[in-house]
Structure formats: structure tokens, C-alpha cells
Amino acid sequence: MTDDIAPSGYQPHRISTLAVLIGFIALLTAWLRRDRRLASIPGPRTYPLVGLGYKLPPKAPALFRKWAMEYGDVFRIRVGWYDWVVINSPEAIAEILEKQAVKTSSKAPSPLGHDVVTGGNRMPTMPYGKEWRNLRSVVRQITTVPMTASFVPSQEFEAKQLLFDLATDNENQRNFYQHMRRYAFSIIMTNTFGTRVKSWDHPDAQNAVRSQAVLRRTSRPGAFLVDELPPLARLPKXXXXXXXXXXXAAKVETGKAPHCYAREIYESRESWYAKGATEEQLAWVSGGLVEAGFETTAGTLNSLVLYLAANPQVQKTAQEELMRAVGPHRLPTFEDTRRLPYIRACVKEVLRMNPILSPGIRHYADEDVVYKEHVIPKGTVLLANTAYLHYDPRRYKDPQKFMPERYLDHPLYSSDYAAMTDPSRRDHFTFSTGRRTCPGARLAENSLTIALAGMLWAFEIRPGLVDGVETEVDMSDDAYLDTGFTLPKPFAARFLPWSEERLQIVKEQWELASKKGYELRGVPVDIEGMTK
């Protein structure tokens, strides 16, 4: 059967041997020609030629924490083709990634993960330059503070369904995991494409999951040998395995599509074309809004459930705050969150403990960079080591403990602290830094805070039961998927209503909302989505 479909002359064993040989020669050449200026930066002993190997080792966050404590502000490693400088202090972050951002805001070349899989159109993996800045401008226009505020009606509406789903569809103690994903996905789909997602088995949700899985695999360090050893990209095409293309295209026709972000981008496309953007890039911007806004928010919400189930005292403190600010007779609203500093602190604390990118945030030096007495050469991968930055005992007392109170003196949004010149004022680095700071950070914090306030108002979150006995909550690294994204593995948890009255309020509020709908930037939205 293989002989019938293989191309003429196709000899996989010879091509594999050729790939290995070219890879070895390329590594040896790179090793002999390596820039020795990095020798002034300390680092762990690793293997010749490949350093740690062609990809990061398992449980890299724990390893990177250990090395940061041993080597200080910066240390160096090698992963495949690239030298890495790992950055471990806010001061070093400010000096390297912010003050010298024009040199350090790029991404390492990714011949397969970026160029092939995304056609070179995906912003998170796009090199810094004119194309990236053009697309960043598109995103900036739809993530301004006023535009972010316009999301609130959809966030409150979806939160009501979330509470209803948690109350009525978690008998197996595991469905909540997908309800969090539906909540986050429906918010961003309604605003971007005008379509609501009523349940997690919605076709759009399943398509997004498949696309996200491809993008996670292809953007992870070491996902493809060709990305860590770029000379392999020069092999004959027959040597490259077929990659699944992941693209989210905005199929919008003027006058027919709902008045959503994808339509706005489509209708203003000529002005973006004039600046150099392409049709494919604008489609990826629309799809990228969904990519950035759904799995990260859902994963953080599920991490919150994990930590809250293990910390009943935190729930007690939050419940007391909710009763003072809201009372037991109505659901909390977004306006109430201004009077819920402890709830907002819970959100900051989970973002500190579980930054969505693991073990940190990667940049790439387009030019030589000077840090103290060190020269970091052009072509070096730069990693903001959140695995250590967020667990530095000098900055955080008992960093392994979930202690929201540590953030009660940080009442502002993360983006506000990121804009400050004093790096020590940063609450955390989860939303990146420098010119690649996440433009949707404020939107994400609102989605998290609205959902959390509602959940803690309505329910006590308890660990799952096995044979009638509560299970111990696993909060170790083993509780998380080893994907380069900090997403908890599915786990068991129960949502117990605080009272029959609150349970009825949850049910009544969703019944009313599902019949009445709401308005989003002046456009009616019903149970299916935007109606015009």
C-alpha cells in the first residue's frame, strides 16, 4: 500500500539520515562560530553543541527557578540552535525588554511553526517590524479602554449562564471545566463574530479547540526540530512532514454579517491594505482575538477553582466581602467589582501563580543588547522567567501559598502597573512586557473578575468526592498539562449553593436574561447572538 502512494524515488531512510547529518553539521558549525561574548553570563553546565537539547526539558519551570536562585539576574543556556538569556528580575526586565525594546521585541525564526503552519500571519509568533506594528494597530483600536468597557454586557450575560450551568450541570463534578471554557469562548465569539456559544459542543467551539491544539504544539519550543535547527528548513520538501494548517478566517459580507469586530475590520480593510496589511493577516487578527481571549481566560478560571477548592479560608474572606458590598439577595454586577478588592486580588494572585505561558515569555534580540557588563548578541532568545519572577521570595512572602491579600495594595489593572516606570511596582508579568504587552489584559481581568464574583457569591467550591470522601487537591506541577501553556488537567470539584434562595436567584436571573437578551454597543443580542 505504501509503495502505491509514495512519490517516485522516495526513500525515507535516506532522507532521515540526510536530515540528521545536516542537523549535526549545522550544529557543529554554529558551535564553532558561536559568539563568545555570552561567556561573561553565568549558566548551568549542559551538553556540547545542543545545550539542553533541541527542546526544553520536562518540568522546566522548577529547573528555571533553581537556576535563577543560583545565578542571579540573568543566566544563559542553549536550546538547539539558539543561545538563550533567561531574565530573572524586574530591573533586568526593564533594562533589556523595555528600555531597549526596539532591539528586543521580536520572535525567534520559526520556519514550520510560524512560516508554514500560519503562513507567517500569526501575531504572537510574528517578528517585530512594520507588519507586526500594523497588525498591532488593528488590535489596539478594538482593545482601548472604552472598547473594553463595551464588552461588559456580554460578560455579565455569559456569567449568568455560567452560574446556571454550574448549578444544574455538574453532577459528575467535572463538567464545570467545560463550562468555564464555554463562558470565555462565547464572550469573545459574540464580540468578534457576532455568534453566541450556548454549549461546549457547539461546532465553533470544537473547531477552536482543534486549532488551539495545533497552535500550542507548533509554538512550543522544540515542537519541531526544524524550528530549533533552522538549517533543516532547507531540506527537500519531501523531507518535511505534512503540517495541519490552522487558520481562523473572518467570513464577513457587508450588510449580511452582524455588527461585530470582524465586520469592522472587514469594512475598514482598504485603509489597512494601504498600510501594507494583507487579507490573510486581517483574517488572522480576527481569529487571533478568539485565540488570545478564550483558552487563557478559561484556563485561569479553572486554576482559580483548583486553588479555591484547596483554600476554604480564602472563600470565607471573599464571601464576607461580597455580603458587605452586595448582600445575599442579588447577583453581583461589574459595577460592584469596584467595591470588591479581595475578589480582584484573587484574580491577580492566580495570574501570579499560574502565568499562562510556561516557563516564561520569549522575545528575540534583533540587535546586540548591552546589560551591565554583558553583551547579549543579536540572534539570542530572551526569556522573561515568570517561573522565578513570580516566586521570588524577596518580592513575595511564602510565594508557594495562595495569598490574595498580598495584592490588596495593588488596586489598579495590570496594564496600569505595566505602564509605570518603576519595575518594582509591577503586580506580575503574566501579560508580558515591553512592546509585546498583551493589549487585551484589561478585558481578560474583567472577564475573570465578573465570573469569580458570581461564583463565590453563589457557591462554596469544594473538592470532588470519591466514595463519599473528599479528595486531596493536587496543586503541584503534575496537576497541569505539560504543553508550554499553564492549563490544569481536568479535575473534580463541586459547586454547593450557599442557600436555596441564592440558587433560585441564579436560575431566575438566567431564565430572565435568556428571554430578554441584551444590547452590545447598541446591537441587540439574543440567545443565538447578534440579531443584526
UniProtKB/Swiss-Prot annotation:
Quote the SUPFAM superfamilies the UniProt record gives.
Cytochrome P450
Q: Name one GO molecular function term.
A: iron ion binding
> What residues bind heme, as annotated?
C438
* Its membrane topology: Single-pass membrane protein
Q: What happens when the gene is disrupted?
A: Abolished completely the production of the naphthoquinones derived pigments and leads to the accumulation of fusarubinaldehyde, the methylated product of pmgB.
Residue spans crossing the bilayer: 15-32
* EC number(s) from the headed UniProt entry: 1.-.-.-
The pathway is: Pigment biosynthesis; Secondary metabolite biosynthesis
EC category = oxidoreductase
Q: What induces it?
A: Expression is significantly up-regulated at the end of late growth phase, in the presence of Butyrolactone I. Expression is positively regulated by the pgm cluster-specific transcription factor pgmR.
Please give the cofactor(s) recorded in the UniProt entry for this protein: heme
Question: What PANTHER family is this protein classified in?
Answer: OXIDOREDUCTASE, PUTATIVE-RELATED, P450, PUTATIVE (EUROFUNG)-RELATED-RELATED
The task this protein performs is described as: Cytochrome P450 monooxygenase; part of the gene cluster that mediates the biosynthesis of pleosporalin A, ascomycone A, as well as a third cryptic naphthoquinone derived pigment, all responsible for the coloration of conidia. PgmC has low substrate-specificity and is also able to use the pgmA product 3-acetonyl-1,6,8-trihydroxy-2-naphthaldehyde as a substrate. The pathway begins with the biosynthesis of the cyclized heptaketide 3-acetonyl-1,6,8-trihydroxy-2-naphthaldehyde by the NR-PKS pgmA.
Give the family, as the similarity comment puts it. Belongs to the cytochrome P450 family.
Q: What is this protein called?
A: Cytochrome P450 monooxygenase pgmC
